[in-house]
Amino acid sequence: MDPGPAGDEVSLAPQQETAEQDVETTLRPRRLSEFVGQARVREQLELVLHGALNRGDQPDHVLFSGPPGLGKTSLAMIIAAELGASIRVTSGPALERPGDLAAMLSNLAEGDVLFIDEIHRIARPAEEMLYLAMEDYRVDIVVGKGPGATSIPLEIAPFTLVGATTRSGALTGPLRDRFGFTAHMEFYEPAELELVVRRSAGILGVDLRDEGAVEIARRSRGTPRIANRLLRRVRDFAEVRADGAVTLDVARAALEVYDVDEHGLDRLDRAVLGALVRSFNGGPVGVSTLAVAVGEEPTTVEEVCEPYLVRAGMLARTPRGRVATVAAWQHLGLVPPQHAPGEATRSLFADEV
């Protein structure tokens, strides 16, 4: 797969590069009052947290689900800030053995927040240990092997677990049921993203004009992390090739350089649609086969590209596989066949290949 000219392409996959993490941290809201968008989630979360604080109780465990880049990690940090607590951060893949989890839990102080990103990827033995920790604030440490093995209970400090997942369907029922509050994060509307871009521009000292903010927000795929990333790339363009002001013309020119089209699709999105249309005549085709065609992992296609393509009405998930809609054919400048669906199937309950 040709990556294109060096420096002329930006990936919109909402995955952070290490060099940009400090900037991302700077742009994160610190309190619920600073968090833009997700109004219903914010209202519900405020009630959960402040209700527990007023009673002097430990808040219920919290689960956030939704596509990457919508603010799940930011909300986890905000929860700790609202509670005046410390936060420990880990991820599901890092918890391979029960001992890994036991060591982390035993180091928690009373009232701490434990944030587990990608919690659906936690190993089953560690997950089973987590059940008891969430309910009774203790874990059982198994000493020895075979018939002579003994279980030693270990008390841990009361804590609040915050889990984040991009695949809520991959969570086991017992784990999901132990969260007292669950919230699904929705894609942002352009007007909300415009507020995100304006706030970030103020923090970064960017000379952002009204039309420039609207254009960046419109092409940000409904995702704040992408909006912030595009703002930084447009800022670079404005400082190097213009007078530093992010106007409409500057934003459009910059986004063209970075290969972000008018619908917010990047190279990978168009590669997925192109393969679906040109190699498989619009589908249906399984996600694994489609991923091979574009040289990516199936999880990347499924978790990064598909949610927005479905929302944009360019891709349909059907029981037989992925299908390009009329909008996808038209976006690629092609005439759609008669069998192409008019809009994406958005059911969350359809069997997927």
From Swiss-Prot:
Domain notes: Has 3 domains, the large (RuvB-L) and small ATPase (RuvB-S) domains and the C-terminal head (RuvB-H) domain. The head domain binds DNA, while the ATPase domains jointly bind ATP, ADP or are empty depending on the state of the subunit in the translocation cycle. During a single DNA translocation step the structure of each domain remains the same, but their relative positions change.
Entry keyword annotation includes DNA repair: yes
GO biological process, one term: DNA repair
Function, in words: The RuvA-RuvB-RuvC complex processes Holliday junction (HJ) DNA during genetic recombination and DNA repair, while the RuvA-RuvB complex plays an important role in the rescue of blocked DNA replication forks via replication fork reversal (RFR). RuvA specifically binds to HJ cruciform DNA, conferring on it an open structure. The RuvB hexamer acts as an ATP-dependent pump, pulling dsDNA into and through the RuvAB complex. RuvB forms 2 homohexamers on either side of HJ DNA bound by 1 or 2 RuvA tetramers; 4 subunits per hexamer contact DNA at a time.
Catalytic activity from the UniProt record: ATP + H2O = ADP + phosphate + H(+)
One GO molecular-function entry: ATP hydrolysis activity
Annotated residues for binding of ATP: L27, R28, G69, K72, T73, S74, E135, D136, Y137, R178, Y188, R225
PANTHER family: HOLLIDAY JUNCTION BRANCH MIGRATION COMPLEX SUBUNIT RUVB (PTHR42848:SF1), PTHR42848
Location of region: Small ATPAse domain (RuvB-S): 189-259
Subunit (UniProt): Homohexamer. Forms an RuvA(8)-RuvB(12)-Holliday junction (HJ) complex. HJ DNA is sandwiched between 2 RuvA tetramers; dsDNA enters through RuvA and exits via RuvB. An RuvB hexamer assembles on each DNA strand where it exits the tetramer. Each RuvB hexamer is contacted by two RuvA subunits (via domain III) on 2 adjacent RuvB subunits; this complex drives branch migration. In the full resolvosome a probable DNA-RuvA(4)-RuvB(12)-RuvC(2) complex forms which resolves the HJ.
Keywords: ATP-binding, Cytoplasm, DNA damage, DNA recombination, DNA repair, DNA-binding, Hydrolase, Nucleotide-binding
Region Head domain (RuvB-H): start-end pairs: 262-353
Spans annotated as Disordered: 1-25
GO cellular component, one term: cytoplasm
Annotated gene: ruvB
Protein name: Holliday junction branch migration complex subunit RuvB
EC number: 3.6.4.-
Large ATPase domain (RuvB-L), as annotated region: 1-188
Matches recorded under SMART domains: AAA
Residues bound to DNA: R317, R322
Record bears the keyword DNA damage: yes
Family from the record: Belongs to the RuvB family.
HAMAP family cross-referenced by the UniProt entry: DNA_HJ_migration_RuvB
Pfam families: AAA_lid_4 (PF17864), RuvB_C (PF05491), RuvB_N (PF05496)
Transmembrane segments: none
Compartments in which it is found: Cytoplasm
Organism: Saccharopolyspora erythraea (strain ATCC 11635 / DSM 40517 / JCM 4748 / NBRC 13426 / NCIMB 8594 / NRRL 2338)
